[in-house]
Regions:
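C-terminal flanking helix
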Residues: 18, 22, 43, 120, ...
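DNA-recognition helix of helix-turn-helix
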Residues: 138, 144-168
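The alpha-helix within a helix-turn-helix
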Residues: 39, 141
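Acidic, proline/glycine-rich intrinsically disordered inter-domain spacer in sigma factors
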Residues: 8, 89-117
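Arg/Lys-rich amphipathic alpha helix in sigma70-family domain 2
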Residues: 64-86, 97, 105, 168
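Σ70-family region 2.3-2.4 aromatic/basic alpha-helix that recognizes the −10 promoter
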Residues: 18, 26, 43-47, 56-79, ...
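A short, charge-rich alpha-helical start-of-domain segment used by transcription regulators
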Residues: 1-23, 33-36, 47
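A short pre-motif secondary-structure segment
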Residues: 126-130
Length: 186
């Protein structure tokens, strides 16, 4: 590849995947501005090393760079958090939520986003790549550096954890908002 056609080729390979890159960065950093910074840094790295790209899936190649950049950024900018396999203390407290919170909690999308953010990063990552970005096991394996079998077992664990978290969130919502079955008249 000549220097002259490098920018055009790079744009053709990378630009179609920027939304997926941002989505992954957003879920890993949990912050829109940080995700934008990570994607920008990832694109700079991708451009710098584009000459080394040997073909194949440009999407998987870019997502691998985004993933690595995210973890590097998180390590440098956030205190190291040791994630327990599943920490019950991460579930929201059982206080009665205000009216605005009730509306958000009843919205399935908001509950799902909250549940996804409660997963450990390694499980959240494979779930986002598979379910939201619709990547194959092979692509996820390429991005994460895991064998395909490990990707499948991680996805199974992630789905199980997500189910537990969603059940916990749903139970908390119904406990704090019990339905009236009937009234007792005197």
């Amino acid at each position: 590849m000549t220097e002259q056609n490098r920018p055009g080729t790079f744009e053709q390979a990378v630009l179609p995947h920027l939304d997926a890159a941002y989505n992954l960065a957003r879920w890993l950093t949990r912050n829109e501005q940080d995700a934008q910074d990570v994607v920008q840094e990832s694109c700079l790295r991708a451009f710098r090393f584009f000459a080394g790209f040997r073909g194949g899936s440009a999407r998987a190649w870019l997502m691998q760079i985004v993933r690595t950049t995210c973890y590097t950024w998180l390590h440098a900018n956030r205190p190291l958090q040791k994630a327990a396999e599943f920490d019950e203390n991460l579930l929201p407290d059982s206080r009665t939520p205000g009216p605005e919170e009730v509306v958000l909690q009843n919205d399935n999308g908001a509950v799902l986003r909250k549940a996804l953010e409660m997963l450990p990063p390694n499980l959240r990552e494979v779930l986002i790549l598979r379910e939201l970005e619709e990547m194959s096991y092979r692509e996820i394996a390429e991005i994460t550096g895991m064998p395909a079998g490990t990707v499948m077992s991680s996805l199974s664990r992630a789905r199980g954890r997500l189910r537990q978290v969603l059940t916990g969130l749903t139970n908390l919502d119904t406990m704090s908002h019990p339905q009236r079955i009937g009234t007792v008249s005197t």
